[in-house]
Amino acid sequence: MIAVARVGQHAAFAILPSRTVFSDQVVIFSLSSRAAFAALQSRPHEVWTRFFSSTLGDGLRYTPSDCFETFPFPEDWQTNTALEAAGQAYYDFRAELMVETGLGLTKTYNRFHDPDEDDPKIVRLRELHAAMDRAVLDAYRWTNVLTDCEFLLDYEDEGDDGSRRRKKPWRYRWPDEVRDEVLARLLELNAQRAAEEANTGDGELFA
């Protein structure tokens, strides 16, 4: 089973035994492959999630009907060996790092996004995340999208007129132009698949 906190700062996904007892503050997916993990933990899915989800303070509220059910996964992602391998490498390294440091997901990702954090293993985790993003983008055949990240600040408009802006924590992320490009492609793909489903009358709509 793949799980993610319903509200969290980082939308960090984990693979847990099916016998685990979950609270209602955890979203559960009946998936367990590393390819599924790679797709969900990737920045393309994060871009989609941040566009469609609501926020609670600095946290992200993950709603499956908005963030998961509408997400256009790459074609044949379940059998994509490159996606499986990238997800496996990232997941295993992250798990080993958490055991070594004794830190959970939130504190590990706080280090991941900290511009002053230069521990070699955190740097390696960032590299593996970029490799996982590359595998996901390649699965979409979007080979011309770059995976380079920067430490950037996000801002949240406050007030009805947007006159006040609240600074949010640093994030190691894609530049805005890359995020916007990937989101536009995902929205287009989502619309194409919804139209195909409507024309054939088979299955559920993607949107």
Segments (PLM) and residue ranges:
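S-adenosyl-L-methionine
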Residues: 1-207
